[in-house]
Amino acid sequence: MDLDQIVADAQQSFEGAADITTLENEKARFLGKSGALTELLKGLGKLDPEARKTEGARINVAKQQVEAALNARRQALADALLNQRLAAEAIDVTLPGRGAGAGSLHPVMRTWERVEQIFRSIGFDVADGPEIETDWYNFTALNSPENHPARSMQDTFYVDGKDADGRRLLLRTHTSPMQVRYARMNRPPIKVIAPGRTYRVDSDATHSPMFNQVEGLWIDENVSFADLKGVYTDFLKKFFERDDILVRFRPSYFPFTEPSAEIDMMFEHGKNAGKWLEISGSGQVHPTVIRNMGLDPERYIGFAFGSGLERLTMLRYGVQDLRLFFENDLRFLRQFA
């Protein structure tokens, strides 16, 4: 067989192999145990020494050419496979980069910390208490009688079971119980705020069954309604970082304060200019509540207020729907990062 023809056939066969398996099969035709070149090498023993030397050299040259073609095709197939994998795993550098998002405080938690900071700066302590309360601390101690509508299951989440004294358990409807607990553990003068989660049977665009509230209490021998007005007005100006806030106190009713007032505020400028916005409930602490705190109402007097942290956050940032704070939509939350 013509060696040049064998080399040409091998090169053509190798070039036509579409994958490694086919290439190895084609290799066996030329370099395998029964391959064309192998058979020629086996036949050298039949030749005389001089012819064997000459023919063996020619066959070895042909074999080297076939092996070179084989290795070249192997490399080409390996490169093609690598390029295919790279294409499948390629990163499109024309796409916008995705930055590593930095964590940030929830807007309501920003308000929580800001409120704490402001009141700490004027001498108030910060207290915390249980979210599962007894009806005595949540209602009775705060001068809410047994037949008060707030005690109904339509307004309050009750918990199965009772405490060690047989009192009913519930999810606190405000953080006022912590004021009673704090006052029973500390002697006047008492200046404290109690921020925390509270629960009521309510849910719409401006109400949530779980919401955050901050309540404040100042009790001493000579604390007046004027002190309440001064403290809360100063708080609003610091919280909203503006001095164009007008504040009014509207007569109202709360069982735990007497007299009681709703606190409204109005901006002189901006999109809420000219609108009175309800911001808090307040009043002089009722003598019965002071007595339930273990204090003498003939000697001590004070004021209390309560504000929704979501409400403050909505007004500060211009949020219209309370439910946005609880949906965990990153598009919304990133605006406050």
UniProtKB/Swiss-Prot annotation:
Pfam families reported in the protein's UniProt record: Phe_tRNA-synt_N, tRNA-synt_2d
One GO molecular function term of this record is: ATP binding
Q: Name one GO biological process term.
A: phenylalanyl-tRNA aminoacylation
Residues annotated as binding Mg(2+) are 258
* Class of this enzyme: ligase
* Matching InterPro entries: aa-tRNA-synth_II, aa-tRNA-synth_II/BPL/LPL, Phe-tRNA-synth_IIc_asu, Phe-tRNA_ligase_II_N, Phe_tRNA_ligase_alpha1_bac, Phenylalanyl-tRNA_Synthase, tRNA-bd_arm
Query: In the UniProt record, which is one GO cellular component term?
Result: cytoplasm
Per UniProt, the keywords (alphabetical) are: Aminoacyl-tRNA synthetase, ATP-binding, Cytoplasm, Ligase, Magnesium, Metal-binding, Nucleotide-binding, Protein biosynthesis
User: Cofactor note from UniProt?
Assistant: Binds 2 magnesium ions per tetramer.
Keyword Nucleotide-binding appears in the UniProt entry: yes
Q: Does the keyword Cell membrane apply?
A: no
Reactions mediated catalytically: tRNA(Phe) + L-phenylalanine + ATP = L-phenylalanyl-tRNA(Phe) + AMP + diphosphate + H(+)
Principal subcellular localization? cytoplasm
Cofactor dependence is on:
Mg(2+)
**Localization (cell):** Cytoplasm
EC number(s) recorded for this UniProt protein: 6.1.1.20
SUPFAM superfamilies linked to this entry: Class II aaRS and biotin synthetases, tRNA-binding arm
* Family as reported in the entry's similarity comment: Belongs to the class-II aminoacyl-tRNA synthetase family. Phe-tRNA synthetase alpha subunit type 1 subfamily.
Its assembly, as annotated, is:
Tetramer of two alpha and two beta subunits.
Q: Which HAMAP family match?
A: Phe_tRNA_synth_alpha1
Q: Name the NCBIfam families for this protein.
A: pheS
Q: What is this protein called?
A: Phenylalanine--tRNA ligase alpha subunit
